[in-house]
UniProtKB/Swiss-Prot annotation:
Organism: Arabidopsis thaliana (Mouse-ear cress)
Protein name: Protein DMP9
Gene that produces this protein: DMP9
Bias-annotated ranges (Pro residues): 18-29
Lipid bilayer topology: Multi-pass membrane protein
Keywords, sorted A to Z: Endoplasmic reticulum, Membrane, Transmembrane, Transmembrane helix, Vacuole
Length: 244
């Protein structure tokens, strides 16, 4: 007889019977919520949200304007652009472009353009007393704004004793002065019309067309003005310029 090998195993018995899994409760579908049952926002909050979006759009427009025209600021008198950026928000307010606001924007643009034009016909010199005197350049020389008191009043002849006399050729009116004045006005208009607050009031309904034009116009103005300023150099240190 042949021997057969039997497998040996160990079986473990437990005293507690296995627990049956409890049936899961049937899933309930969420009840639909009617839109009419939701609480409605007050009209003031909705209006405030609209004003907030409008202010954000204005802020983005200002930031875009500054980024595109930052290279042109050096061609302007320092106080002109500062005055424009300070007065424009008070005129524009919340974007209400009525007839009065549009007229005030026209007057602001005219005033800033005139300052850019006339400030390029000013120059300055440092007198022997250490003070800096400003004046308009004329075909005869520099017409000083505020002359010192005469000698009989204890002032002394400061202009005659200045290091550079006002009748010098450098203080006489030249073609370069007109070129720089016209280019300065052109630069300011490029910066002003790059602002959506200006184009939105002056050209209502044509914001897209103006945006397309002003995408490249400031760059072209910067290139042309840079070339002309190299061809027609100037040594003026007038109002709004840093004195040497």
């Amino acid at each position: 007889m042949e021997k057969t090998e039997e497998s040996v195993g160990i079986r473990v018995y437990t005293a507690t019977p296995p627990q049956k899994p409890s049936p899961s409760p049937p899933s309930r579908s969420p009840k639909p919520v009617l839109i009419s049952s939701l609480p409605s926002l007050p009209s003031g909050a909705a209006a405030g949200g609209g004003r907030g979006r409008k202010r954000r759009m204005v802020a983005q427009g200002v930031q875009k304007t500054v980024s595109k025209t930052s290279m042109l600021v050096n061609f302007l008198p320092t106080g002109t652009l500062l005055m424009f950026e300070m007065v424009l928000p008070s005129i524009y307010r919340d974007g209400d472009c009525n007839g009065i606001n549009t007229l005030m924007i026209h007057l602001l643009l005219l005033l800033c353009a005139m300052s850019c034009f006339f400030f390029h016909f000013t120059d300055s010199f440092k007198a022997s007393d250490g003070k800096i005197y400003y004046g308009f350049v004329t075909p005869r020389g520099l017409a000083v704004f505020m002359k010192p008191p005469p000698p009989e009043f204890g002032g002394g002849d400061v202009i005659a004793e200045a290091e550079i006399p006002v009748t010098d050729d450098r203080y006489k009116l030249t073609v370069n002065d007109f070129v720089h004045a016209v280019m300065s006005v052109l630069v300011f208009m490029a910066i002003a019309f790059s602002d959506r607050r200006v184009t939105g009031c002056l050209f209502p309904g044509k914001e897209k067309e103006m945006d397309q034009v002003m995408e490249s116009f400031p760059i072209m103005v910067g290139i042309v003005c840079s070339a002309l300023f190299l061809v027609f150099p100037t040594t003026r240190y007038g109002v709004g310029c840093m004195t040497g």
